[in-house]
Amino acid sequence: TVDPARVAAIFREEGLIPVAKLAAFRDPAGARADRTMAIGYTGQAYLWLDNKASADGKPWLNPYADAAVQYIGDLIDELHTAGFEQVVLENVQFPASTSSKQDYGTTNGVSRADQLRADMAVWEQRFGNGVTLWYSYTLAEVADTSSTLGVPAAQLGVKNLVVRVPSASTMTAEERAALVQAQAEAGVEHVVVRDNAAGYYE
């Protein structure tokens, strides 16, 4: 079993800042542990999966569920207690596939983008300056509107952004600079570009 506190301590001993990563709403273990936090399957008693069960489909936490937002916040708190002052959140989003079979419960007409904004606001208010929260999104989710977010990532009010560049879309230094500038103009305070094909992560 990995001890997060020991991992954080080792990084600090080496003069490095320990940073943890969470999968946020793409958490099948959490979804199965408490079904009230998960996206349901319309008209059925079981959970919605992001693929066929035979193809290893996974359930997701429901961004509209207060319990799911609280649960993710509690995970962040556990990491902070273990010594991680920065946490990268991936999958602060809705599943890429959309279907009438997805049951999000009562949404009160709140859009996907507004719900994600509200979820982020809960975490930011809870942790304030105690934990630096980063939000990690694909280049496509940053550059344009997607079904997963409802708006480009910066319009969610993200202050600390990690942009994941797919290998097929590796960027030149000029393109990366333009991307960072565009996000700054959209209100993002800190941008990290992860372009593995170019060996770039800063």
Regions found by a protein language model. Give the residues of each.
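Glycine-rich tight-turn/loop motif centered on a GG-T
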Residues: 100-114
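Substrate-binding cleft of secreted/luminal carbohydrate-active enzymes
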Residues: 153, 157-202
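Aromatic-lined carbohydrate-recognition surfaces of secreted/lumenal glycan-active proteins
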Residues: 19-27, 88-91, 110-149, 164-167, ...
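Aromatic-lined carbohydrate-binding/catalytic grooves of carbohydrate-active enzymes
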Residues: 1-2
